């Protein structure tokens, strides 16, 4: 594995599905305050020309994580699982020597219905092994 050198930047990617960019003060909204996002953006590279062609949770997340269309990943609805053959942004950063973390909602491994009887000890949104798509840490 490659080692990330001391000059490699920290990378934080926010994946807010179903959030319109213009709903943030960063992009012109004046009725909402998001001071933490604003501070983070002020000291960051902000991508201003990105799009999700499928505004549904699981397909949008799969597209953002893999860079592939929903019809290619098989995520056309919310109740699907990610194939082990998919390469994600987590895999790519891990191969480059980064430690990777996923914090928040996953929603890419639910199957038809979450196993409600197993929550919260083994929630389906924190899968094991390859189903984590390259992310080391989960919260």
Regions found by a protein language model. Name each.
Residues 1-139:
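Formylglycine-dependent sulfatase
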């Amino acid at each position: 594995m490659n080692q990330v050198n001391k000059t490699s930047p920290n990378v934080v990617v926010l994946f807010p599905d179903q959030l319109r960019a213009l709903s943030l003060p960063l992009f012109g909204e004046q009725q909402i305050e998001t001071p933490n996002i604003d501070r983070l953006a002020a000291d960051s590279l902000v991508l201003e020309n990105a799009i999700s062609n499928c505004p549904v949770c699981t397909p949008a997340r799969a597209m953002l994580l893999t860079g592939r269309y929903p019809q290619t990943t098989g995520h056309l609805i919310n109740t699907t699982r990610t194939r082990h053959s998919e390469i994600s942004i987590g895999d790519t950063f891990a191969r480059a020597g980064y430690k990777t973390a996923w914090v928040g909602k996953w929603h890419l491994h639910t199957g038809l219905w979450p196993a409600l009887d197993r929550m919260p000890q083994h929630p389906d949104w924190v899968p094991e092994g390859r189903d984590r798509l390259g992310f080391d840490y989960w919260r």
